[in-house]
Amino acid sequence: MLVYQDLLSGDELLSDSFPYKEIQNGVLWEVDGKWVVQGAVDVDIGANPSAEGADADADEGVDDQTVKVVDIVDTFRLQEQPPFDKKQFVTWVKRYIKLLTPKLEGEQQETFKKNIEGATKFLLSKLSDLQFFVGESMGDDTSLVFASYKEGATDPIFIYFAHGLKEVKC
């Protein structure tokens, strides 16, 4: 299994269990998330309640707490952040580029520098529709993960900066 860690913080942000599609000349990855239900307990002890005279709809004191979560957010313990306005986002991108560029090597660095402007404009065009997430450490100088919904979709898509991820074999 491959895990993708944030190059700046080491937080696990993605794994190969979630296939990605490269967008914006490979600078960004798009990953489909899914809403899932957690905590549902379905216990079947094989008894026939109607034969025992019990009400089939009786709860019998079991508190079955279910929660709907997005699989990627839950799996990698992503922490939602307040939304950014345009000025805050541009400030974050500039700092991110400054921190990330020295960690990239050769061709990767050139590709990143060449295409980051287009990727930034792409994200700016969607800014009001984006949700912002960081990894578990919640550091200030980390990669952001963006979530949004395509028109008419019920499940979110997640957008990652590809060059900000380090592939680690587990």
Swiss-Prot record:
GO CC annotations, alphabetized: cytoplasm
Subcellular compartments: Cytoplasm
GO molecular function: calcium ion binding
SUPFAM superfamilies referenced in this protein's UniProt entry, alphabetically: Mss4-like (SSF51316)
Domain TCTP: 1-170
Keyword annotations from UniProtKB, A to Z: Calcium, Cytoplasm
InterPro entries in alphabetical order: Mss4-like_sf, Mss4/transl-control_tumour, TCTP, Translation_control_tumour_CS, Translational_control_tumour_p
Main location class: cytoplasm
Known function: Involved in calcium binding and microtubule stabilization.
Protein family according to the UniProt entry: Belongs to the TCTP family.
Listed name of the protein: Translationally-controlled tumor protein homolog
The organism of origin for this protein: Fragaria ananassa
